[in-house]
Amino acid sequence: MSNVPADLKYTDEHEWIRTEADGTLTVGITDHAQSTLGDIVFLELPAVGKSVSAGDAVGVVESVKAASDIYSPVSGEIIAINEEAADSPEEVNSDAYGVWLFKIKLADGASTDKLIDADAYGKLID
């Protein structure tokens, strides 16, 4: 089984989400996702300031085997992207939970209720 940290939330599309002290959300792809994709060679990240809805495709991760969309886990505004990850996408393979992709501020009235916990995500990928 892949590594699934208990302190994070997850999506069915294999993104991980960490809620920061200021209420913003930090998003990356899971260890299972990077393992399935193989050697990651390119990341296309969303534009800072972009408003997105939950489930929107906001970026792309490309590996030597495949390309996969990155989805927004919630509705909100992209407030930061990880330029270092875009410049060195292979780092996601070595530290999927340490390398974040983007940060998002929840839209008014938006919720994290549809995110799943580590136990549910672990069952999803087993």
Curated annotation (Swiss-Prot):
Instruction: Give the UniProt entry's GO cellular component terms.
Output: cytosol; glycine cleavage complex
Sorted keywords for this record are: Lipoyl
Write out the GO biological process terms: glycine decarboxylation via glycine cleavage system
Recorded hits in InterPro entries, A to Z, give: 2-oxoA_DH_lipoyl-BS (IPR003016), Biotin_lipoyl (IPR000089), GCV_H (IPR002930), GCV_H/Fam206 (IPR033753), GCV_H_sub (IPR017453), Single_hybrid_motif (IPR011053)
Which domain of life does the UniProt lineage start with? Answer: Bacteria
The record ties this protein, via PROSITE patterns, to: BIOTINYL_LIPOYL (PS50968), LIPOYL (PS00189)
Cofactor(s) listed in the protein's UniProt record = (R)-lipoate
Specify the Lipoyl-binding domain's residue ranges: 24-105
Residue list for modification N6-lipoyllysine: K65
Q: How is the cofactor bound?
A: Binds 1 lipoyl cofactor covalently.
**Pfam families tied to this protein:** GCV_H (PF01597)
Q: CDD domains attached here?
A: GCS_H (cd06848)
Q: What does this protein do?
A: The glycine cleavage system catalyzes the degradation of glycine. The H protein shuttles the methylamine group of glycine from the P protein to the T protein.
List, alphabetically, the NCBIfam families matched. gcvH, PRK01202.1
Describe the protein's quaternary organization and the partners it interacts with.
The glycine cleavage system is composed of four proteins: P, T, L and H.
In terms of HAMAP family, this protein maps to:
GcvH (MF_00272)
Annotated family: Belongs to the GcvH family.
This chain's protein is named Glycine cleavage system H protein
Organism of origin is Burkholderia ambifaria (strain MC40-6)
